[in-house]
Amino acid sequence: MKLLVSPINREEAIIASLGGADIVDVKNPKEGSLGANFPWVIRDVKEVVNGRQPISATIGDFNYKPGTASLAALGAAVAGADYIKVGLYDIQTEAQALELLTKITLAVKDYDPSKKVVASGYSDYKRINSISPLLLPAVAAEAGVDVVMVDTGIKDGKSTFEFMDEQELKEFTDLAHEHGLENAIAGSLKFEDLPVLERIGPDIIGVRGMVCGGDRRTAIRQELVEKLVAECQI
């Protein structure tokens, strides 16, 4: 499994990079689960990582606003993100999801076809009035997306595993692979979840709180990144 770590500033990005994260993900927790950070923060992180890892950037938890989302996605791509990640928050239908993701993918790939688009559903989709992540792989593949992900929409300490069990997450992973997509699992994951994640087999796991000592509002600790990297390689 690859490890995606989500710093919020330059200093944390250096720690995540030196700790051995496979992907350095720029987000802004103050603006939500997949809250967008500023373009200059993405550029700054890109500079300090200096090619050691690809950069991912979130553009927000989006309802049905394809124009706004596609413009935000292009902004993240121009700022230097290699992966552009959008959350499908309060998306009511597969048709809405398809149009949103198609327009985002067009905006990104028209600028640079090598950049990857990540579509995130939410394990707690019933709490946030959105579509099931299990519907996402087929829609994302049709839209030309590269990676599908599941995360928690409401960051209240509850884990993805409290909303989707091992069987459902394995189904999500298998559906992604059947559609030729990479997949990622995130959402208040803990070290004790690693054996289950190994059985599920996602390509990527996304963390913040786990490498902050359990509280995503505190700073990332390099020794915890290193510990997680080591355990992911066992």
Swiss-Prot record:
Catalytic residues (positions): K27 (schiff-base intermediate with substrate), K85 (proton acceptor)
Transmembrane annotation, as ranges: none
Root EC class: lyase
InterPro entries, per database record: 4HFCP_synth (IPR007565), 4HFCP_synth_arc (IPR035081), RibuloseP-bd_barrel (IPR011060)
Alphabetized Pfam families for the sequence: 4HFCP_synth
Gene Ontology biological process terms in this record: methanofuran biosynthetic process
Keyword terms, alphabetized: Lyase, Schiff base
Enzyme nomenclature, EC number: 4.2.3.153
GO molecular function: carbon-carbon lyase activity
Catalyzed reaction equations: 2 D-glyceraldehyde 3-phosphate = 4-(hydroxymethyl)-2-furancarboxaldehyde phosphate + phosphate + 2 H2O
Pathway(s) the chain acts in: Cofactor biosynthesis; methanofuran biosynthesis
Family indicated by similarity: Belongs to the MfnB family.
Function recorded in the entry: Catalyzes the formation of 4-(hydroxymethyl)-2-furancarboxaldehyde phosphate (4-HFC-P) from two molecules of glyceraldehyde-3-P (GA-3-P).
HAMAP family in the record: MfnB
Name under which the protein is recorded: (5-formylfuran-3-yl)methyl phosphate synthase
Organism: Methanosarcina acetivorans (strain ATCC 35395 / DSM 2834 / JCM 12185 / C2A)
